[in-house]
């Protein structure tokens, strides 16, 4: 199964306030993110993280936290992602800025474009290719895009799957 999520903002205390997250502190936020992630994702699954995994965490703490998240993790880099530490980078099967993939449900295949940022126009958009992105944190501009926002707050701090994307 493929899962999609964005804007975890681990170790970013201000994200609790500016994103109006329902957590008292970082410890509660991290505990809940890990719990919801590992309840849903299995080790054989792939999770596409559409950017902003963390912002101010010490690398040791960040590495330890990301390492316990189940699944094969693909990072579509966002504006807060620093992957210069090889130990951290190795937690991801791939790190890129933009990715085109196919996902399927009930034998039907769909094209998806994955990027941290919303894009005004993308490959095969007129043929129904789905754009998944993060970054905007439910801003009013989201209404202008034929899209699916995968930001943590927008998806109730859990992951999207292709069936839920198709319902949007």
Model-derived features with residue positions:
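Core catalytic region of metal-dependent phosphoesterases/phosphodiesterases
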Residues: 2-103
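Conserved small/polar residues in nucleotide/adenosyl-binding loops
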Residues: 158-164
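Structural motif
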Residues: 2, 46, 112, 130-132
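Active-site-proximal beta-strand elements of phosphoester/diester hydrolases
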Residues: 2-9, 111-117, 154-156
């Amino acid at each position: 199964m493929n899962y999609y999520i964005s804007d975890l903002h681990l170790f970013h205390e201000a994200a609790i306030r500016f994103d109006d997250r329902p957590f008292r502190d970082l410890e509660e936020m991290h505990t809940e993110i890990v719990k919801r992630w590992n309840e849903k994702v299995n080790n054989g699954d792939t999770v596409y993280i559409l950017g902003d995994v963390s912002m101010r965490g010490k690398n040791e703490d960040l590495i330890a936290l990301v390492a316990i998240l189940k699944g094969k993790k693909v990072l579509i880099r966002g504006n807060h992602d620093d992957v210069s530490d090889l130990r951290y980078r190795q937690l991801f099967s791939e790190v890129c800025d933009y990715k085109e993939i196919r996902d399927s449900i009930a034998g039907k295949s769909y094209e998806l474009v994955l990027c941290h940022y919303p894009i005004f126009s993308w490959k095969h958009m007129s043929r129904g290719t789905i754009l998944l992105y993060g970054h905007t944190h439910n801003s009013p501009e989201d209404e202008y895009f034929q899209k699916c926002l995968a930001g943590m707050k927008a998806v109730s701090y859990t992951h999207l799957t292709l069936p839920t994307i198709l319902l949007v």
